């Protein structure tokens, strides 16, 4: 959790039965400014991503499961059936993703998405307040065979209810 430094990867190749994906380079930088402030940045030709704030790598998935579990019955049932965790996440961070193209995302998750302009995803997670917000803007995209001039997605829980909005312009 207290990593400092860089990892640089040159000529990354991901192989799948349907398609191969090549990434000319990838750089990850992690810095810990103090016990309450960290930053992880990942930069490649296809995307730039960052997470900044107070977080623990080992509790990031648990944070999302606990917040979403209050609103999604399937998450709550999974949580109840597992052994209780001995730690409580106290994450409070913001995240930012700039996606120049969706080729890697489409290959890894088998989503038929093509971007014709860069997409952005921004948001935050705050465990103490039990809050999360994620907003995505995708200008000019194709999903399957359908072209959209733009799309906007918003997921948040500002009060004690979960809201999700999606808008697609053809």
Give the role of each language-model region.
Residues 1-170:
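Interface amphipathic segments
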């Amino acid at each position: 959790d207290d990593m400092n430094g860089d990892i640089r990867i040159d000529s990354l190749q991901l192989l799948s039965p349907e398609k191969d994906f090549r990434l000319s380079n990838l750089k990850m930088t992690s810095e810990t400014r103090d016990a309450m402030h960290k930053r992880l940045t990942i930069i490649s030709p296809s995307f730039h991503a960052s997470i900044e704030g107070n977080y623990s790598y080992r509790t990031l998935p648990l944070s999302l499961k606990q917040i979403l579990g209050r609103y999604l019955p399937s998450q709550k049932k999974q949580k109840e059936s597992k052994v209780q965790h001995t730690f409580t996440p106290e994450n409070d961070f913001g995240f930012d993703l700039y996606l120049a193209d969706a080729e890697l995302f489409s290959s890894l998750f088998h989503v038929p998405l093509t971007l014709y302009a860069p997409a952005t995803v921004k948001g935050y997670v705050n465990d103490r307040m039990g809050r999360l917000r994620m907003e995505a803007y995708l200008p000019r995209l194709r999903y399957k065979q359908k072209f959209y001039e733009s799309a906007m997605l918003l997921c948040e829980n500002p009060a004690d209810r979960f809201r999700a909005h999606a808008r697609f312009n053809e």
